[in-house]
């Protein structure tokens, strides 16, 4: 399978090269970029060996179609929409790591991503409706048959996987869900940003995007799909001074206040028993982002507050792997008819 990595020098593209370069099932046949076009891979990343040392080409639909069966679009929001229809028409399957196709309505995307909507004049509501949300734990079968996959955001991944068993089976109320998440600075991408400068975020912890963070609506859309009911929740993200990693704490009210921590742990473990990358920890063992760094795993823990019938679910992921490119590779594996974790059996070099 020939794979194009478009946006190769961003964090998503770098992870894609690292994850695919030694995978015998795939060949990196095209690297695309704009600012970096005309340079070799080794010119940009001499510390990441790529045997073929591909030339990074100017992004071109025709060139991608000539050289690849599947395109991983590791691009800023809005840009993917300028390429996707042309690629699909030429028979290239698309896995988009941006938010361009995560919503089933183009109008909703335009409302949430209003700045990008002003810059990119889109008319592809049909593709928004066609795209499959690329969270394998929810859409496994649909992903395997799709030609356009919208890979989820990192925060939604860290929240929806732990919520899924409880919402889909009606174990928690649809109201009163609270998600408190903390992310490393790489979640903001590779472009310079004052907020992520070491002197700005080092030795500090800060919340941002309260109420109106873009991922709130993405989480609500999928949570509503899972539960079959409209869900409105509270989501508060925080920036923490580390490069990679994400920790989410999710609160919900149990419909059966008699459920214990052990009961809820069994619910999680049974639901995800066929997913080797999901590790449900024993009761009273709480996960650390260090445990999943540089892996595609998600670690979950659950605790019930019997005083008030609330459940607390903890999740940790590497925001650049399971929260981004590793998940895109899982989607690539599914559309290629391969095991979901092919090429993702990575070792965490603890500590």
UniProtKB/Swiss-Prot annotation:
Places the protein is found: Cytoplasm
Keyword Oxidoreductase attached: yes
Gene Ontology MF terms in the entry: N-acetyl-gamma-glutamyl-phosphate reductase activity; NAD binding; NADP+ binding
Catalytic residues (UniProt): 154
EC number: 1.2.1.38
InterPro entries (alphabetical): AGPR_AS, AGPR_type-1, NAD(P)-bd_dom_sf, NAGSA_dehydrogenase, Semialdehyde_DH_NAD-bd
An annotated GO BP: L-arginine biosynthetic process
Organism superkingdom: Bacteria
Family: Belongs to the NAGSA dehydrogenase family. Type 1 subfamily.
HAMAP family: ArgC_type1
Function: Catalyzes the NADPH-dependent reduction of N-acetyl-5-glutamyl phosphate to yield N-acetyl-L-glutamate 5-semialdehyde.
Name of this protein: N-acetyl-gamma-glutamyl-phosphate reductase
Protein source organism: Prochlorococcus marinus subsp. pastoris (strain CCMP1986 / NIES-2087 / MED4)
Lineage: Bacteria, Bacillati, Cyanobacteriota, Cyanophyceae, Synechococcales
